From Swiss-Prot:
InterPro entries: Aminoacid_DH-like_N_sf (IPR046346), NAD(P)-bd_dom_sf (IPR036291), THF_DH/CycHdrlase (IPR000672), THF_DH/CycHdrlase_cat_dom (IPR020630), THF_DH/CycHdrlase_CS (IPR020867), THF_DH/CycHdrlase_NAD-bd_dom (IPR020631). Its EC number is 1.5.1.5, 3.5.4.9. This is Bifunctional protein FolD. GO terms for biological process: L-histidine biosynthetic process; methionine biosynthetic process; purine nucleotide biosynthetic process; tetrahydrofolate interconversion. One of its GO terms (molecular function) is methenyltetrahydrofolate cyclohydrolase activity. It comes from Campylobacter jejuni subsp. doylei (strain ATCC BAA-1458 / RM4099 / 269.97).
Length: 282
């Protein structure tokens, strides 16, 4: 069994991005990511701090806009519009979730696609579905693909099962795997017999937010397992969606939680931001 070490790979990517940023600075461009946080969700605050720290590590300027819980939808749209027209800002990220009185889809669609480094804008989703690399790809699925590529895992002809059908992970993940030549099945909470799919899979990607959803009796020998889930137990321990201790015994490759997919998600956000800055140079 080989661990798919996202922490080590993300560190390597950050070093490469640091060099690219030094080149951009020599051309008068400083990569810049604007992050908007609405309210005081503790988890969101932690995520925003980690993103700002990661930016600092590889030479990206970060601007954090922390708005209060009562910020109106129009006020948020006005800020995004200002950032859309600010040439010194190359990436805009709105930290989710948003308060109930704000329409998430409207907000995400208001970010100009050329600064949508999260890859959620309909234009970028369209590029992905057409198999084009013109836009920005969603960070978590992109991080998974980079991780598999780094370990020279050939996806052509692989039977892949994705558990979770969200617009953030499951759906774009399915499209990326299809584009890479895999045969893809997408399962979700209404799937009748999950094991029927997982036992035949060469690759399983779990992104459902459910502790121990994937167990040893549900996988075959030699399976490749990518655990996107992040769950906090009452003890405070962070675990994924996979029964790691048992499933790892049957796996050829598996991601740990933490230090698997999480660091890669942030690395891809940084990579997309630098890509946007480079596009400005071109």
């Amino acid at each position: 069994m080989t661990l798919l070490d996202g922490k080590a790979l993300s560190a390597k990517i950050k070093e490469e991005l640091k060099e690219k940023n030094q080149f951009l600075k020599s051309k008068g461009i400083e990569s810049c990511l604007a992050v908007i946080l609405v309210g005081n969700n503790p988890a969101s605050q932690t995520y925003v701090k980690s993103k700002a720290k990661a930016c600092e590590e590889c030479g990206i300027k970060s601007l954090v806009y922390h708005l209060n819980e009562n910020t109106t939808q129009n006020e948020l749209l006005a800020l995004i519009n200002t950032l859309n027209h600010d040439d010194s800002v190359h990436g805009i990220l709105v930290q989710l979730p948003l308060p109930d009185h704000i329409c998430k889809d409207l907000i995400l669609e208001s970010i100009i696609s050329s600064k949508d480094v999260d890859g959620f804008h309909p234009i970028n989703v369209g590029y992905l579905n057409l198999g084009l690399e013109s836009g920005f790809l969603p960070c978590t699925p992109l991080g998974v693909m980079k991780l598999l590529k780094a370990y020279e895992i050939d996806l052509k002809g692989k039977d892949a099962v994705i558990i979770g059908a969200s617009n953030i992970v499951g759906r774009p993940m399915a499209t990326m795997l299809l584009n890479a030549g895999a045969t893809v099945s997408v399962c979700h909470i209404k799937t009748k017999d999950l094991s029927l799919y997982t036992r035949q899979a060469d690759l399983i990607i779990v992104a459902a937010g459910c502790v121990n959803l994937l167990r040893s009796d549900m996988v075959k020998e030699g399976v490749i397992v990518v655990d996107v889930g992040i769950n906090r137990l009452e003890s405070g321990k962070i675990v994924g969606d996979v029964d790691f201790e048992e499933v790892s015994k049957k796996s050829s490759y598996i991601t740990p939680v933490p230090c698997g997919v999480g660091p890669m998600t942030i690395a891809m956000l940084l990579e997309n931001t630098v890509k946007s800055a480079k596009n400005r140079l071109n």
